[in-house]
C-alpha cells in the first residue's frame, strides 16, 4: 500500500560514547559498544503539529491535525518490550515513520490523530485540558513542546483528577500528586506494555546490549574502592555503604531542596520503608 510513497525512515542516530570521553578515559562504568541497534522509544515529543521551525512557539497552528496509522508491532531490545511503528499520512511530513507506546484496545491498522480539535478516542494525542476528569492518560509532557517525561514505560497509567485555570492535577503511578501545565500533550487511554520475556541464557546477550560485567567493591583492592582490601572475605569495615568516590550511597537526599518544580508537587510519592 505504501510502496508508491518514499517512506523516510526515522533512523536512530546514536550518540553513544561507550562510556568514555574524548580522551578515552572511562567516565561511565559498565558500558561498551552496542551491537543490537534497535529502534528505541525516542519519538516522545509531539512536535508534528508545528511548522518547519518546530521549536518556535509563535508558529503554533491550532487547527492543524496530524494523521497516523499503526503499521505493526516491533521489538525494542533495549527496553525489552514491544512498541508500535506508525506512519504519518500527511504530505507535509513526507510519510515518516514514528514509534509510540502500545495503548490498550488498539490494534494494527487503526488511525490515530494528533491535534487540539480532534475527537476523544483511545490512542489519540491531544492537550490534557481537552480530556475529561477521571480519565487514564500516559506519555505525558512536563513542559509544552519539550517531549514526554511521565508514564512512558510503566504498566499503570496516570489518573487525571482536576482541571483548573492554569494547571491540571494528576496522580502518577508512584502515588505522587502534582500540578502540570494544562497545554501539555498526552495520549488518551491506559498504557499496555507487552513484555518479551527474553531468556538471557548467556552473558553474551547483555554484551550485545552494551553492558559490561560488574565487579563488587569488596572484591577490589583498597586503592580501587572504599570497600576493598583485607585478607580473604572481609566485611566492608564501615558504618554504611559507600560509592566508589567515597560518598554515602544510602539515605542521602539527592534532589535539590530549592528546585523550581517543588511547589507543583502536592503530595510526595510513597517511599519504601
From Swiss-Prot:
As recorded in Swiss-Prot or TrEMBL, the protein's gene is named rpl2
Task: Write down the InterPro entries for this protein, in alphabetical order.
Answer: Rib_uL2_dom2, Ribosomal_uL2, Ribosomal_uL2_bac/org-type, Ribosomal_uL2_C, Ribosomal_uL2_CS, Ribosomal_uL2_dom3, Translation_prot_SH3-like_sf
Superkingdom of the source species: Eukaryota
The alphabetized list of GO BP terms reads: mitochondrial translation
Keyword Plastid found = yes
Q: Which NCBIfam families match?
A: rplB_bact
SUPFAM superfamilies per the record? Translation proteins SH3-like domain
Tell me what this protein is called: Large ribosomal subunit protein uL2c
Q: Which GO terms describe its cellular component?
A: apicoplast; mitochondrial large ribosomal subunit
Signal sequence: where? none
Q: Does the keyword Ribosomal protein apply?
A: yes
Q: Where in the cell is it found?
A: Plastid, Apicoplast
The alphabetized UniProt keywords are: Apicoplast, Plastid, Ribonucleoprotein, Ribosomal protein
GO molecular function terms attached to this record: RNA binding; structural constituent of ribosome; transferase activity
Subunit (UniProt) = Part of the 50S ribosomal subunit.
Task: Give the family, as the similarity comment puts it.
Answer: Belongs to the universal ribosomal protein uL2 family.
